[in-house]
Amino acid sequence: MSSSVSSVRLPLRAAPPLYGRREWRADGARAPSPALVAVKPLSCRAPASYRSALLLHRRRRYALPPVAATATSKPVLKDPKKYQEWDSLTAKFAGAANVPFLLLQLPQIILNARNLLAGNKTALFAVPWLGMLTGLLGNLSLLSYFAKKKETGAVIVQTLGVISTYVVIAQLAMAESMPLPQFVATSAVVAAGLLLNFLNYFGWLPGTLWLLWEDFITIGGLAVLPQVMWSTFVPFIPNSLLPGIISGSLAATAVVMARMGKLSKGGINFVGSLSGWTATLLFMWMPVAQMWTNYLNPSNIKGLSAFTMLLAMIGNGLMIPRAVFIRDLMWFTGSAWASFLQGWGNLACMYCFDSISRESFLATTFGLLLWLGFTLWRDTIAHGNSSPVTSLKELLFGK
């Protein structure tokens, strides 16, 4: 990948040749150079659009040569070869995250299948279909976000997440744990979401249809997120659908105003980014709810699987290098949060209550810190920065 060169401000007219004082006085009536003639203001008889386009073409034609532009710019420290190597490696890391994420759902799918074959439908009622539906909506939102950015590895991760979660939901519907109308509506949304994201990824989808889909997941995500957060503390606060209704109504109003052009450019961009951030916050809230449950019922910690938490930490950790490399703050926030809180945080709770050994916890902690250090070190080299702090600043505040 070629390094970018900082732009220089070009003069409106080409600079005259440099002469000594004597030569300039002797040739005072010197004829203008072809470049000067070419960039003279055009006749006012030509249309304004034609004059501006032609003038722009001539400015580009007689612009400073590349050597002059390069000489006035800052030196580029980035090594193209190392940049491309790290680009390819981070993409492979993101793709490899499919393995731990798929292993997270397979045990539940196999267990549900065994119970269904044995006729034990009651066992599937222990799996909350509303929670699975929430995760499915989060996967669809993130799938749309990464499909728009053409991040192949992340697209595959989210697609497998949608499919595996939908399989569990289908099993719950077969056990009559999930009502049939909700399952039919969910199936329609999943089919439409996968089809639209597939078409958009390959550039085969009209922009109008994609905007409608983005509006749908924005409103749906903003309606679900506050409701899930509210439901976490239901034993201590009254059970109510009001948070979801209010948030969904506000989201619908914001989307309509953005499409009607009633918002500023910054407001429109903010509304456009809501679906991705909503899905990220939704996944970020899940480990918070788990740790809140651990706090209320410490005895439940014995039922947690250390292997499951380790898979969650590894899967999210594998996506951190790619998020840092492309300077995607939303992706980095979600992956780092899940890796630390959902994975390492729950392992820390299990260690505090003697569910896992000290050696296992320390080895996991050391491995996670070593991985983060390796990520920042390689990213610093790839981008040609002087220190990892510079990479973090670019991630948080942009270049």
From Swiss-Prot:
It is a multi-pass membrane protein. GO terms for biological process: maltose metabolic process. InterPro entries: MEX1/MEX1-like. Its main location: plastid. GO terms for cellular component: chloroplast envelope; chloroplast inner membrane. It is found in: Plastid, Chloroplast inner membrane. The chain crosses the membrane at residues 93-113, 123-143, 154-174, 180-202, 217-237, 238-258, 268-288, 306-326, 361-381. GO terms for molecular function: maltose transmembrane transporter activity. Residues 1-67 form a transit peptide. The keyword Transit peptide applies. Probable maltose transporter. Essential for the conversion of starch to sucrose in leaves at night, probably via the export of maltose from the chloroplast. This is Maltose excess protein 1-like, chloroplastic.
